[in-house]
């Protein structure tokens, strides 16, 4: 689960991290009052969407020369002008896809005199089984380019969970970021705070980009992105309360009601598979034969007929889907249950696109018999390779 920047900063502030003063607004009428709460004279107006690249993004409704999703303002009138342009419009960034995201809230923040922009994040390093700091002296809007072109500029420091952030860890991090004086002292206070917040709130990612050194030598968290482990949310009602469902895909929200692992993608072949590994292999082979998957959908090992029906409905709710591939290897999952669920869904929602079904495993013959005797236009496949070729061909021919 993700939250907005202003929410992430409020959470970090509660742990003692240095963040700028700011006010979130939801309508243009709130702009002037919000700006008056800040010291000024420099203000920053920030679009609040669950995607990065906001500064370089463009609004669909504005011209190509219009400013992006993060703007500087040097007066309250300029704040109001930016708010009027940004709020309610659609911001397209390198992370939103061409559809973009509607900006329904803005964060007006006190400006800062920036001397240096650094990058910092915390994540779970699965290679070592520990939380790791990832830092770079090259912070800001071009961090993806830095990671691609000069990966040696990105340093990782793993933290022993028993010891926590040690003096040696702090020395390694501050040295990697070339910090000294007050900035180094601030960092030595800040980094344990960030680690504590990450662990206590069961985060999957905490990204501060940029982490700045101001001209007065002090440090500040200028931007913050947080993602939380969905499996641990039951322990954090305060975090769940921050969820903004308008930023999430409606199909993913519906899937979560049935404990289905669903991720919307940009292709046109819907997939329903049992098992994450098989689901990824299914997506790979669709791409191998020249098409693109419309989703990742793992129905799990203990799916019921009702769960399968719900999964099918979620797939067909996507107007981009031009064909569906059902790929089931029945172990715990029984092929006849899948077959009954698919047929029930087809009868319920109708079938206007090609459907290929590949079944293997427990009760496979019964499952195939149910499908073959249904009288519905369902294409049967012998194996995964055969299934992928058939669905790609059917979609191209449609």
UniProtKB/Swiss-Prot annotation:
Every copy of the ATP-grasp domain together lies at 9-254
- Which SUPFAM superfamilies does the annotation name? Glutathione synthetase ATP-binding domain-like, Succinyl-CoA synthetase domains
Cofactor(s) needed for function: Mg(2+)
Name its pathway: Carbohydrate metabolism; tricarboxylic acid cycle; succinate from succinyl-CoA (ligase route): step 1/1
Per the UniProt record, which EC number(s) apply here? 6.2.1.5
Q: Which residues bind Mg(2+)?
A: 209, 223
Cite the binding residues for substrate.
274, 331-333
**Molecular function GO labels:** ATP binding; magnesium ion binding; succinate-CoA ligase (ADP-forming) activity; succinate-CoA ligase (GDP-forming) activity
Q: How and how many cofactors are bound, per the record note?
A: Binds 1 Mg(2+) ion per subunit.
Binding locations of ATP: 46, 53-55, 109, 112, 117
Catalytic activity as recorded in UniProt: succinate + ATP + CoA = succinyl-CoA + ADP + phosphate; GTP + succinate + CoA = succinyl-CoA + GDP + phosphate
Task: Give the GO biological process terms.
Answer: succinyl-CoA metabolic process; tricarboxylic acid cycle
Q: What cellular-component terms does GO give this entry?
A: cytosol; succinate-CoA ligase complex
Q: Which PROSITE patterns match?
A: ATP_GRASP, SUCCINYL_COA_LIG_3
Functional note: Succinyl-CoA synthetase functions in the citric acid cycle (TCA), coupling the hydrolysis of succinyl-CoA to the synthesis of either ATP or GTP and thus represents the only step of substrate-level phosphorylation in the TCA. The beta subunit provides nucleotide specificity of the enzyme and binds the substrate succinate, while the binding sites for coenzyme A and phosphate are found in the alpha subunit.
Q: Which family does it belong to?
A: Belongs to the succinate/malate CoA ligase beta subunit family.
Name listed for the protein in its UniProt record: Succinate--CoA ligase [ADP-forming] subunit beta
Gene source species: Allorhizobium ampelinum (strain ATCC BAA-846 / DSM 112012 / S4)
